[in-house]
């Protein structure tokens, strides 16, 4: 198997078999399945709808749901990697063919990729920016009163509590900084704020 653009990791052997299964689908079946996959890629939080659509596809095409899920997992390998690495439609097509998908189906998929590229890129960018949104920050100054190192006694430190939003949940992160580290951190935060104001 040639090198893939979407991942450096070794690809499970089952992926090749899944691609062969995809090759056996008719053009309309592959088109319908691709439609389901792109719905999921553009709205990945809709897992239940995705599974319902897969189940419906399996029933209407007399395919077992278990193998179909495996096929979709293998097919998702390329677009997921492509989103992370910003691959072109041509690179997506090449990767699918390298994994064993027929040229006709790989070309069809890459055309769909091209049509949805801007929506997918915006979603991926939004995810990247929203992953660790800082909601609140608290800090307290302290003075070291006892330490095994004599020169550290009397030194000022700072305890930070960051409230970070990860998806729909918030998480508290704690850290302790020396005064020079804190001023360096503050300086970086000011630079980030200035950059954000320039962009808005």
From Swiss-Prot:
Residues 133-200 form the COMM domain. It is found in: Cytoplasmic vesicle. CDD domains: Commd7. It holds the Pfam family COMM_HN. GO terms for molecular function: NF-kappaB binding. Scaffold protein in the commander complex that is essential for endosomal recycling of transmembrane cargos; the commander complex is composed of the CCC subcomplex and the retriever subcomplex. May modulate activity of cullin-RING E3 ubiquitin ligase (CRL) complexes. Associates with the NF-kappa-B complex and suppresses its transcriptional activity. Belongs to the COMM domain-containing protein 7 family. Component of the commander complex consisting of the CCC subcomplex and the retriever subcomplex. Component of the CCC (COMMD/CCDC22/CCDC93) subcomplex consisting of COMMD1, COMMD2, COMMD3, COMMD4, COMMD5, COMMD6, COMMD7, COMMD8, COMMD9, COMMD10, CCDC22 and CCDC93; within the complex forms a heterodimer with COMMD9. Interacts with RELA. Interacts with CCDC22, CCDC93, SCNN1B, CUL7. This is COMM domain-containing protein 7. It comes from Mus musculus. The gene is Commd7.
